[in-house]
């Protein structure tokens, strides 16, 4: 509430001027800032019908800072004219004055001065008239004295164009007496206490009306992490494109499904401890589809299905090793094997979004644990052209239009492509995904019919999130150093579809 003294002074002013009073006049009469008077009006309105206040707007002209300076010291052109002696003044010396550039231009337009470019000592400025009348200063002084009505609109607009005048809208209140008007402030109670009820003095108290429309205190609640917001958008995009979500509840996977089923040789560097987290307990898996396992073993060690294989001694002990899955393609392999067991093949489109784990060196764009997004399409006759078309459609829905494709090598896809997107924050191209056409050596041992092709792509969830939220360091998005305030403040992510 405003100061009680100001409230009572305002009420006394309304009492004296029975017909009403303007808040601007009250401000001037009491010698206080108008905003304080407005605050007093609001406080009195909160007390009930003590006063009635109607807001009104009025416009008036007032001088800018430069305008006030000119009203006191004269216009720039007048100052330039007065600075030129009878013998003239070198132009370069004139331009060094504070008002030199603007004043020279205006004085030339007014034909008060002339420039002699052929003068012996260099360009020199001379007066062309004996005396001048500083009309700009005179007009500004009229406005300063509250006589702006004496100026024509054209003159005001010219001064406004020179940024010497400004048209200001002032909001004020017309204040009159209310039905419960009194010059005495009666404190309103905000709470009904047990003591008031026990003593009965609540009957003499005046209570402040309860505002049922007031906003309550916002309840504390959970906030979605930016990753989860973007994950929701990705999931919606896949569903819009007609994909079915794959179950991804197995963080621990066997080397067979994670590597061998994908036609990745057991000597591949990615299977080394430097890139994979192996599980110590349970260390080995024992349940596999035996007929499928034998076909995988054969295509690795001897070849088949039109392939020479890798020609090495494939070991079941290596395939049994449990690990934290390094990609969700292991899930895709399980789903494609399940699809191959159906009596009749039907085209499918699968997707998944879940965590994967890699024993990588941490830096601004790499984590040991991150989310992989995977899309898989299986149908007859799919080619690299189909893959590129789906990728363009998919990434356009993400709002990522700056894309580059680069040929790559994957043991289980041929041809293969890496997908890069330009990161505005890092000012460089960042790899956001990998893609390719699954090899026959992977698909045919599963039991899928010849002629069926499977195109697939995968990307991380973290890097597109960094791009959309303008985050340069992945450790600011995920990990123990994340600022929780960022989670509270991060806006909803809308991918431009």
UniProtKB/Swiss-Prot annotation:
Keywords: Aminoacyl-tRNA synthetase, ATP-binding, Cytoplasm, Ligase, Magnesium, Metal-binding, Nucleotide-binding, Protein biosynthesis. It is found in: Cytoplasm. Mg(2+) binds at residue 414. The keyword Acetylation does not apply. The keyword Ligase applies. InterPro entries: aa-tRNA-synth_II (IPR006195), aa-tRNA-synth_II/BPL/LPL (IPR045864), Phe-tRNA-synth_IIc_asu (IPR004529), Phenylalanyl-tRNA_Synthase (IPR002319), PheRS_DBD1 (IPR040724), PheRS_DBD2 (IPR040586), PheRS_DBD3 (IPR040725), WH_DNA-bd_sf (IPR036390). L-phenylalanine binds at residues 329, 372-374, 412, 438. GO terms for biological process: phenylalanyl-tRNA aminoacylation; protein heterotetramerization. Its EC number is 6.1.1.20. Pfam families: PheRS_DBD1 (PF18552), PheRS_DBD2 (PF18554), PheRS_DBD3 (PF18553), tRNA-synt_2d (PF01409). GO terms for cellular component: cytoplasm; phenylalanine-tRNA ligase complex. Its cofactor is Mg(2+). It catalyses: tRNA(Phe) + L-phenylalanine + ATP = L-phenylalanyl-tRNA(Phe) + AMP + diphosphate + H(+). It comes from the Eukaryota. Heterotetramer; dimer of two heterodimers formed by alpha and beta subunits. This is Phenylalanine--tRNA ligase alpha subunit. It comes from Danio rerio. The lineage of its organism: Eukaryota, Metazoa, Chordata, Craniata, Vertebrata. The gene is farsa.
